[in-house]
Amino acid sequence: MGLQCGIVGLPNVGKSTLFNCLSNAKAQAANFPFCTIEPNVGVITVPDERLNKLSELVIPERVVPTVIEIVDIAGLVKGASKGEGLGNKFLGNIRETNAIIHVLRCFDDGNVVHVDGSVNPIRDKETIDYELQLKDLESVDKKLQKSEKMAKTGDKDGRREVEFLTIFKKHLEQGKSARSAPVEGKDRDVIDDIHLLTDKPVLYVCNVDEASVVNGNKYSEIVKEAVKAEGAEVLLISAAIESEIASLESPEDRQSFLADLGLTEPGVNKLIKAAYRLLNLSTYFTAGVKEVRAWTITKGMTAPQAAGVIHTDFEKGFIKAETIKYNDFVKFGSEAAARENGKLSIEGKEYVVGDGDVMHFRFNV
């Protein structure tokens, strides 16, 4: 299952520095606007201690973690929706992502210029929100015009679309994002085909200085208060610290560095886990001598759907799923031992896969 998060923010908020820490790709982190001319795409390995533990027990030929794609979207500026700065092209890049990671500058540094001349994360957030909302309003307007023509012919679908698109339009005109529009459940399908930017789930990252990475600062507190109503998660990360961690070769050095700062894990790990929560994802495992592998699924997926993530044939010809809970696998040390102790269950088509399940699918095509 592909998962793509777009990192957005005004120029010089620490977006590309954070991206460099997250991925194997290296964007040019320069102290001037628009250093990210093309959207950089990086692939992040999702850290999971359970995968490491299973690998120790099974000793496979290879270990395959699950990954997340991160896209570094060029710095947006006022007027982006009208083509200013790098404009429409990059709003299009955001449209292709599953979720938005919004980086806000929450540190003072006279050596790093700010496009608006001062540090104000709420102003920065509102600038980005406004540009995305304007672009969404344009998309809703276009579809609404088509739906109104259909409605005039007596088309039921057209009338329904007009009703709910009008709600989205009014909501956006009030300077609010589509994700908070008062439209529930299946009625939101009227916007499925136009992929509204502000309907995507969002995670806010406060890029703070080293001294504020544990408890935050005045800027991050303002951000937390401002996004309360959205119900969005806010993370404290120091891109500068993450850069230092990434430059350390040994795990021991990294752990020692983190401990000195009062941290238990790198900020990028917290960010990846938060992205999982944001998209309602979970992980199951396959474990054999050839390969131990982590697979990403959406929470609530049934066994056949989870099997389909490996290959569509697995879903089409699904017969059953031999399932061991992760804790049982670790407790008994192997699939055979778990089976002997009655901890291997045979699950059918209705089984909802649990996070951490170790699975073996039987199928016939």
Which ranges hold each PLM region?
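Short amphipathic alpha-helical segments
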Residues: 30-31, 112-116, 216-218, 248
